[in-house]
A protein has these predicted regions:
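Short hydrophobic segments within beta-strands
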Residues: 1, 18-19, 97, 185
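Short beta-strand-to-loop junctions in surface cap/lid or active-site-entrance loops
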Residues: 1-11, 170-175
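Short beta-strand element of the alpha/beta-hydrolase
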Residues: 10-21
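Short beta-strand segments enriched for Tyr within beta-sheet-rich domains
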Residues: 13, 43, 117-118
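Serine-hydrolase catalytic-loop signature spanning alpha/beta hydrolases and amidase-signature enzymes
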Residues: 21-25, 45
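Short N-terminal helix/helix-N-cap motif within the alpha/beta-hydrolase-1
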Residues: 26-28, 196
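Short amphipathic alpha-helix adjacent to the substrate-entry channel of hydrolases
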Residues: 29-48
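Active-site-proximal cap/loop segments of hydrolase catalytic domains
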Residues: 48-248
Length: 248
């Protein structure tokens, strides 16, 4: 958790659930400019090391295999319930924010899951797993040496890129289930998660009559490498949170 918001009573705080990217990655105890920006506005920011995270032993990493969109997702909502039960956060004032895999988790939190979050912010997210695996297969080849495809299929728990379960875990294909406002932010020059993944989500949400805002960062890559676009992302994120989940 990020430091307690200044001036808070340390109880019943508004929460930002912030899963990291990867998913085979981790958060560190050092300075995090994005998390700290939200904490400075009065939010308790929780960065969970959910199953599938690396750096805590092989058992935790492998516990994520086959759990993408499943137990990797409920690890987050279980943390919400724990923090609320301990009186640290207000169960009715919770949003989810993330980038890359964390962006997928943010979208899944209000589509695959429901009745948990008041809003979702997804930066450079995968929204359609079917389309994303098809791209990986097309660009990386179909054989066993396509390490990217094997990585994703291991976490997704599928043996075929056309497995029907992928549609049931794809937020863009579940847009009619969205139960909270969604902010999408994506760099147009992203070569890791293509910009079209946010376009898929925005178009599906709009067709379903759901509340969505999309912010395009022209010339920006997956990692938000430019200070000006990082600043814009922070401003858009905080404004969206304060609109839909006011800290005070």
């Amino acid at each position: 958790m990020r430091p307690w918001p200044a001036g808070s009573a340390d109880r019943n705080l508004p929460l930002v659930m912030m899963p990291h990217g990867g998913p085979a990655s981790r958060d560190h105890a050092g300075f995090d400019w994005w998390a700290q920006a939200m904490a400075s506005r009065g939010y308790l920011v929780f960065q969970p090391q959910f199953r599938g995270s690396e750096g805590f032993g092989q058992e935790l990493l492998e516990a994520g295999y086959g759990e993408y969109g499943r137990k990797m997702q409920t690890d987050l909502s279980d943390a919400v319930e724990y923090l609320a039960g301990a009186g640290l956060v207000d169960r009715e004032r919770v949003c989810i924010v993330g980038a890359s895999y964390g962006g997928y988790a943010a979208l899944a939190g209000v589509t695959v899951q429901q009745d948990i979050y008041r809003c979702a912010v997804a930066v450079a997210p995968v929204s359609d797993l079917v389309a994303d695996l098809a791209r990986d297969r097309r660009e990386g080849g179909r054989d066993r040496y396509n390490t990217s495809l094997r990585y994703w299929m291991r976490f997704l728990g599928v043996d075929d890129h056309n497995d029907p379960i992928l549609a049931t875990l794809s937020p863009a294909r579940l847009a009619d289930r969205a139960d909270a406002p969604i902010l999408l932010i994506h760099g147009r020059a992203d070569t890791v998660v293509p910009y079209e993944q946010s376009e898929f989500m925005e178009e599906a949400l709009s067709r379903a009559g759901k509340e969505v805002k999309m912010v395009t960062l022209d010339g920006e890559d997956h990692y938000l490498s430019f200070p000006a676009t990082r600043l814009r992302m922070l401003e858009e994120t905080i404004a969206f949170l304060e609109e839909h989940n006011p800290p005070r």
